[in-house]
């Protein structure tokens, strides 16, 4: 179960969820007609070794990504990745040259998207996650397509100061992303995160988030109790918070941003992928998720 000052690397707790997502992106990239291609996702999984290699090779039929849930989850990751990739292309076309990846994890967009000259990508995450990513990509010989600046910081600490210390200019437009992040923050921390984004964003800035509507608390408590009883500290329901400070579109619209939200199931439909069956394990998850982007001013 999470604590106020818990720490992690790429193999435990919140950190290992980045590998699960990377394995999903790797499986999406292997499809005949992928929604998004992230070749580095498989590189990360192979570097982590063990079950993660089996996950991307599909050689372990018991791995969660080989189940019905896994098929739905890979579709989810393909659609989500495409949504945010398209967002960053709009951002680049609008002339924004500062990009901030909050809880960057194993996001490889600084290496795989065609950024305009002069773009700086700031990657915020805990030091051990950034170290793993840096070393794996260095050994692979990867070269970023923008100037990449690591900002080793826990988002529960003073991350705005750390971002500024690494050269971020709040007087210039910026583009932000919180992908796969908010469920790991309690509502008060979400509020602080949104406020920090708003305070550092000049007119013409953009933000994109993935958010989940909380499930009924009695349902969540049962799932959390089952997760804790399993003895697996990395179980999903032992890591997440069932909280939301406010729907993102509402929060940012009240502060002068123009926002647009789509549900994940709508996004799946738009890209030609099926939503999970109503009685499936993934249905509650995808049915609660929305994707939003907004522009300030």
UniProtKB/Swiss-Prot annotation:
Domain of life of the native organism: Bacteria
UniProt protein name: Putative S-adenosyl-L-methionine-dependent methyltransferase MSMEG_0614/MSMEI_0598
A single GO BP: methylation
InterPro entries, per the entry: Ppm1/Ppm2/Tcmp (IPR007213), SAM-dependent_MTases_sf (IPR029063), SAM_mthyl_Trfase_ML2640-like (IPR011610)
Family: Belongs to the UPF0677 family.
Record function comment: Exhibits S-adenosyl-L-methionine-dependent methyltransferase activity.
Enzyme Commission number(s) from the entry: 2.1.1.-
A matching Pfam family: LCM
Family matches, as PANTHER family: S-ADENOSYL-L-METHIONINE-DEPENDENT METHYLTRANSFERASE YKTD-RELATED (PTHR43619), S-ADENOSYL-L-METHIONINE-DEPENDENT METHYLTRANSFERASES SUPERFAMILY PROTEIN (PTHR43619:SF2)
UniProt keyword annotation of Disulfide bond present: no
List of residues binding S-adenosyl-L-methionine: 125, 154-155
Organism encoding this protein: Mycolicibacterium smegmatis (strain ATCC 700084 / mc(2)155) (Mycobacterium smegmatis)
Keywords assigned by UniProt, alphabetized: Methyltransferase, S-adenosyl-L-methionine, Transferase
Top-level enzyme category: transferase
MF (Gene Ontology): methyltransferase activity
